[in-house]
Curated annotation (Swiss-Prot):
Topology of this chain in the membrane: Single-pass membrane protein
Gene name of this polypeptide: NCKAP1L
Function: Essential hematopoietic-specific regulator of the actin cytoskeleton. Controls lymphocyte development, activation, proliferation and homeostasis, erythrocyte membrane stability, as well as phagocytosis and migration by neutrophils and macrophages. Component of the WAVE2 complex which signals downstream of RAC to stimulate F-actin polymerization. Required for stabilization and/or translation of the WAVE2 complex proteins in hematopoietic cells. Within the WAVE2 complex, enables the cortical actin network to restrain excessive degranulation and granule release by T-cells.
Annotated Basic residues bias: 639-651
Protein name: Nck-associated protein 1-like
Length: 1127
């Protein structure tokens, strides 16, 4: 064939287009096979029982289906013909695409044979590679087509529906049906078709021999050759890494195996006639048990080849070779690849370390980086496909590698280095192209003996393009584009490889060598990312997810491999590379796989890291707990006993010797590994993996590993804080707030110390967790310490205080437990003193304290509701008492008519206990707030001081609400005002409500003398209170009055004065009582009057003096003191 014809045939362009088209068709066949093999995604009518007879008929008669005379068989198809057409059009067109692809492939292969093209991977690399790729892609398409079990039904049913709808079958059906029948036994038909192409195919494959032998060496040979080592020869470290066949150095061995196995499978004739072909074929058979057709679809090399050759005459020796090779693979390949992986781990780690330290070496040694990536990818893919498919083996350890994560991590490390230092690579290779390659190419062109015009124009353009390059283009961030140059070189390879070409490439190897070098250098300027994908793409994991997950699980079990575990989420970013524009429907599924597995891997890593952090926190908390003051009692006791002679020399039996804090640091031998050591080691490894990358992308989603860790840490810290509280709903036990605070501080202190190592925002994690603990429920809907402590204080401490087993001691500023048998299991003072209230405020914060206050106020208002009911029941009598309280005779007849007076006092005391507890909690909050925010506390207190009785009530309440949130005490409690305001009143008018409030104070005032009869109403100087908590009445009277009269917009002072007068009269009348039982604790009760005045800012001692002589109070104090000392 003439040279002009070679130009016209456009072999390079057709190979490029058909290879890309072939990949698309192959993926479509894969997608159809995958869809039809899964009942969930299979076309619905293929699963319908009513359609079964039609499907059997179509399958049996295919392709000769008589649609018009088969209505009884095809009735269901006729009913659903429109739906079938709609659903199967894509499937049918995909099969038509296969047929058209086949036609174009054979046309091109025949043209190449007619041109008598010469193939040599070392010279015309692109031409040879594209030729072999096309053969393998075409074979894979046909093999996959034959593996689609429903192919006849899909094609036949579509054609039947088409004929029913349009009156005639699809024009392509006849040829398509015939093609499907021909490829029922695909390899037999393919070998027949490829017989004429044996010379070209075998020639191309034989050019691989030297390269394949060199790339198929074992780890020992690699080691002795110092493969990938930059430091084995220091003087040559900056010399450019060149080769006569640059692209061959990082060409995948898996790709070569596919070429050789499938090539000799189709053109097997040369195996008996050519010893070189036979040697190459046998060597390749000893490499793998399986080769990949596409994704997880594989060809079982030895079985398929043996089955084919066994059916052919004269191939007995080849069958024996196959069996021998299979035995060799089973016996040796696992160990062979295991040793190569071990070598690569060491060699690539060294390479990465050197390049990271001296990134400038990426210029001259860029080839080493891509070789390393290609070698790792080959070993990983070999392991994956054999682990997936080799199910029965005597040596399962050959197909499992617990250190695979390190290899994946190194692959990602090299990729990251190349991307990070892309400018270094570009600057070096731009100068190489402009100052060396262009000059050498120019010299070679001038020395060519023959150079046709077309070739001359192309090569001259090469020199021109390369000579025009300058460094400013890199500095200015200019985008380079050399795809045109590389396509021209591809064309030139085609032109110079035909038999009758004036310029033969194999006669001018120097031209091929320099052009292959130029192609690599040009790719370093504009296609580094594509080259990274070509050499290191591991998207195969997207289709071997079970193996992927298994490898990840094995990595987590090896503590030494934990630091490399981040490689698995990073590999998920590769999945985007397995998509193809001819099969867009795959994209969402692949995206889901990538994101789901990336998410699950990071979730597991974050979970493991947070577990490790929290375990160490728990250990730290245990150490911190040993330093609590309560543990020093034993030490003090022992020290005291040493001074006495009675101390025993030996400890009592059953009393274990308690280790002193710090004993855990004493170690006789450093080889002794403690649990803390193991945890710290694991945490170090996990921190390295979680902190390896700040972010990366998976299918256009940006992933931040630190966010996974932050969310897990936050959730775990929330649960840990609640666990530290030790709340037991059955026994109503809970940890003291001060002890919980010490534990929380131990946790927080350790997490803060890890901030710079974990990569997570430790401050944010702590802030969020602690903030959530100030709410009733956390972000997961679980109870927080705010809820637990609120419930405990209400249900345990305050309930017992209401029943009289716990009293408020103003002297101790705490609630105190009274010594009674079997009624309580905790000491009230340990949970309510100043330090505990401060710790509670520190833990719950302003929000938590507000929640606590709201719950307290709910209980207060429920008591107020009951009090109002009692007032309403006695309203008529109370109205008379209010008018006649100064008339003893009338009062003597009215007072006995009151009902529920003791109940009123009891409920008011409960309110007082609750409000007293709230006041103590508020004081704790004020101290904490002053400590944390003194610059805020000052202005708040100053603002409160500006409030006067004349200030608008809304403004007053707003200021008091602000002050109350900071823990500052107020004359009017805004929380109580709001709680009472929220009570749903009945139909009574505001005037009636106000009247009830006034009468409530009257009811209380006239009921006070009843307290004198209670033996518990004795005033204790030691506790500065009463054993029945009636001293809390004063707070209840003042706070409730202030809230009620604020709500009704009345003068608080006036009504409190009225209360003082009525109460004074009632107590003075008690002095005239002759019954000693009724006056038993008269003096103690009299002291309540002074307590009321001290509690209120609205009342003064002068006001009290006007209605209750101070001499009585003085006498009462003296009597109480005398009685206390006598007792």
């Amino acid at each position: 064939m003439s040279l002009t014809s070679a130009y016209q045939h456009k072999l390079a362009e057709k190979l490029t287009i058909l290879n890309d088209r072939g990949q698309g068709v192959l993926i479509r066949m894969y997608n159809i096979k995958k869809t039809c093999s899964d009942p969930k995604s299979k076309p619905p009518f293929l699963l319908e029982k009513s359609m079964e007879p039609s499907l059997k008929y179509i399958n049996k008669k295919f392709p000769n289906i008589d649609v018009r005379n088969s209505t009884q068989h095809l009735g269901p198809v006729h009913r659903e013909k429109a739906e079938i057409i709609r659903f199967l059009t894509n499937y049918y067109q995909s099969f038509v695409d296969v047929m058209e692809f086949r036609d174009h492939v054979y046309e091109l292969l025949n043209t190449i044979d007619a041109c008598q093209c010469h193939f040599d991977i070392n010279l015309n690399f692109d031409f040879t590679r594209s030729y072999l790729d096309l053969i393998v892609t075409y074979t894979s398409v046909i093999l996959l087509l034959s593996r689609i079990e429903d192919r006849r039904i899909l094609i036949g049913m579509y054609n039947c529906a088409h004929e029913m709808l349009h009156g005639h079958g699809d024009p392509s059906f006849a040829r398509l049906g015939q093609m499907v029948l021909e490829y029922d036994h695909p390899l037999k038909k393919l070998t027949e078709e490829f017989g004429p192409h044996t010379k070209a195919v075998s020639g191309a494959l034989l050019s691989l021999h030297f390269l394949f032998v060199r790339r198929n060496q074992g780890a020992e040979q690699w080691r002795s050759a110092q493969l990938l080592s930059l430091i084995s020869n220091p003087p040559a470290m900056i010399n450019p890494a060149n080769s006569d066949t640059m692209a061959c150095e990082y060409l995948s061995v898996e790709v070569m195996e596919r070429w050789i196995i499938i090539g000799f499978l189709l053109c097997h004739g040369c195996l008996n006639s050519n010893s070189q072909c036979q040697k190459l074929w046998k060597l390749c058979l000893q490499g793998s048990l399986y080769i990949t057709l596409i994704r997880e679809d594989v060809l079982q090399v030895h079985k398929v080849t043996e089955d084919l050759f066994s059916s052919l005459k004269g191939y007995g020796k080849r069958v024996a070779d196959i069996k021998e090779s299979k035995e060799h693979v089973i016996a040796n390949s696992g160990q062979f690849h295991c040793q190569r992986r071990q070598f690569l781990r060491m060699a690539v780690k060294e390479l990465e370390t050197v390049l990271a330290d001296e990134p400038g070496l990426l210029g001259p040694k860029a080839l080493f980086a891509f070789m390393a990536l290609s070698f790792i990818r080959d070993e990983v893919t070999w392991l994956v496909r054999h682990t997936e498919n080799v199910t029965k083996t005597k040596t399962p350890e050959d197909y499992a590698d617990s250190s695979i994560a390190e290899l994946l991590f190194l692959l990602e490390g090299i990729r990251s280095l190349v991307r990070r230092h892309i400018k270094v690579i570009q600057q070096y290779h731009l100068q190489y192209l402009a100052r060396f390659d262009a000059l050498v190419l120019s010299d070679i062109i001038q020395n060519l003996s023959v150079c046709p015009e077309e070739e001359s124009i192309i090569m001259s353009s090469f020199v021109s393009i390369l000579s025009s390059l300058n460094l400013k283009q890199v500095d200015n961030g200019e985008k380079f584009e050399f795809s045109g140059l590389r396509l021209d070189w591809f064309r030139l390879q085609a032109y110079t490889s035909v038999a009758k070409a004036p310029l033969h490439l194999h006669e001018n190897p120097d031209l091929a060598k320099v052009m292959n070098l130029i192609v690599f250098h040009s790719r370093m300027l504009d296609s580094v990312e594509k080259l990274l994908v070509e050499t290191s793409d591991l998207s195969t994991f997207c289709f071997h997810l079970r193996i992927f997950e298994k490898m990840f699980a094995m990595t987590l079990e090896e503590s030494a491999m934990l630091r490399y575990a981040i490689a698995f989420p990073l590999i998920c970013a590769h999945f985007v590379h397995c998509t193809h524009e001819m099969c867009p429907e795959e994209y969402p599924h692949l995206k889901n796989h990538g994101l789901h597995h990336c998410n699950s891997f990071l979730e597991e890593l974050a979970k493991q890291t947070s577990n490790c952090v929290l375990e160490i926190c728990a250990e730290q908390r245990n150490l911190s707990e040993q330093l609590l003051p309560k543990h020093c009692a034993t030490t003090i006791s022992k020290a005291k006993n040493k001074k006495t002679r009675k101390q025993r020399q030996t400890p009592r039996k059953g009393e274990p010797e308690r280790d002193k804090p710090g004993a855990e640091s004493h170690r006789k031998n450093r080889s002794i590994v403690t649990n803390m050591d193991k945890l710290h080691l694991n945490l170090t490894e996990l921190a390295l993996t979680m902190n390896h990358v700040y972010s990366f992308s998976v299918f256009e989603h940006t992933i931040f590993p630190s966010e996974y860790l932050s969310s897990h840490l936050e959730a775990r810290l929330n649960r840990a804080i609640v666990w530290l509280a030790g709340y037991n709903a059955t026994t109503q036990e809970i940890v003291r707030p001060s002890e919980l605070l010490a534990g929380v501080k131990a946790y927080i202190g350790f997490i803060q110390s890890l901030a710079q190592f974990l990569g997570a925002d430790a401050s944010r994690v702590i802030r969020n967790a602690l903030l959530q603990q100030t709410q009733p429920l956390d972000s997961c809907g679980e109870q927080t310490i705010t809820t637990l402590y609120t419930n405990w204080y209400l249900e345990s401490l305050l309930r017992q205080a209401s029943s009289g087993t716990i009293i408020l001691s103003p002297a101790m500023q705490a609630f105190v437990s009274l010594p009674r048998e079997g009624e309580q299991n905790f000491s009230a003072e340990e949970f309510s003193d100043i330090s505990e209230m401060r710790a509670l405020a520190e833990l719950l914060g302003p929000y938590g304290m507000k929640f606590l206050s709201e719950n307290l106020m709910w209980h207060v208002t429920s008591q107020i509701v009951e009090l109002k009911k009692l007032v309403v029941e006695n309203m008529d009598i109370l109205v008379q008492i209010r008018s006649n309280f100064s008339k003893p005779d009338l009062m003597a007849s009215l007072l006995p008519q009151l009902t529920g007076a003791e109940n009123v006092l009891k409920r008011m005391t409960i309110i007082g206990v609750i409000l007293s507890f709230r006041a103590m909690a508020q004081e704790g909050l004020r101290e904490v707030f002053s400590s944390h925010c003194p610059f805020l506390m000052g202005p708040i207190e100053c603002l409160k001081e500006f409030v006067t009785p004349d200030t608008d009530i809304k403004v007053t309440l707003s200021i008091f609400e602000l002050a109350s949130a900071a823990g500052v005490g107020c004359d009017i409690d805004p929380a109580l005002v709001a709680a009472i305001a929220n009570l749903k009143a009945d139909t009574s008018s505001p005037e009636e409500e106000y009247k009830v409030a006034c009468l409530l104070l009257i009811f209380l005032a006239v009921s006070l003398p009843l307290l004198a009869t209670d033996p518990s109403s004795f005033y204790s100087i030691e506790k500065d209170g009463y054993n029945n908590n009636i001293h809390c009445l004063t707070k209840a009277i003042i706070q409730v009055s202030a809230a009620l009269f604020t709500l009704y917009n009345k003068n608080i002072e006036t009504h409190l004065k009225e209360f003082l007068v009525v109460a004074s009269v009632s107590l003075l009348q008690l002095g005239q009582e002759t019954d000693k039982l009724k006056t038993r604790n008269r003096e103690s009760i009299s002291l309540l009057m002074r307590l009321v005045v001290e509690e209120s800012s609205f009342l003064t001692l002068d006001m009290l003096e006007s209605c209750f002589p101070y001499v009585l109070l003085r006498n009462a104090y003296r009597e109480v003191s005398r009685a206390f000392h006598l007792n």
